[in-house]
């Protein structure tokens, strides 16, 4: 999980009740929503020692806009753009894996069904589509 407020939080709480060892949080920065990190495996992208050449970063077929944001993450890590990009890098690590984090084999999303595949969720769905990783939104799993 990316540890987002709302659906991610409720999903994490539910899984923690039945199998806390199955929860893995990949964070855009170490103290992201610190309260929800208790009792589960967490890894921030800062701790992963990623580089622009890391497979989780370079193998994504990104648009020019996304690619520029990701480049800024490595070139100017304190910039506002880099902070925004840290969420995209986190999403790429969740999909592609890195180090101890295995790549995903499937994904469940809570998406805005009136405007699907937008924002960070849409970005991650696009990565899944590119890699032919099956995924479902609440239109499927919520029935």
Residue ranges with predicted function:
Residues 1-142:
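Acidic/glycine-enriched connector segments
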């Amino acid at each position: 999980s990316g540890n987002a407020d709302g659906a991610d939080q409720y999903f994490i709480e539910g899984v923690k009740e039945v199998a806390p060892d199955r929860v893995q949080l990949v964070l855009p920065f170490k103290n992201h929503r610190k309260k929800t990190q208790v009792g589960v495996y967490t890894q921030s992208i800062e701790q992963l020692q990623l580089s622009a050449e890391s497979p989780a970063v370079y193998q994504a077929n990104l648009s020019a806009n996304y690619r520029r944001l990701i480049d800024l993450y490595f070139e100017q890590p304190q910039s506002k753009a880099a902070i925004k990009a840290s969420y995209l890098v986190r999403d790429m690590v969740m999909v592609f894996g890195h180090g101890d984090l295995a790549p995903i084999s499937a994904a469940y999303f809570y998406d805005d069904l009136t405007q699907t595949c937008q924002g960070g969720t849409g970005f991650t769905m696009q990565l899944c589509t590119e890699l032919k990783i099956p995924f479902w939104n609440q239109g499927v799993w919520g029935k």
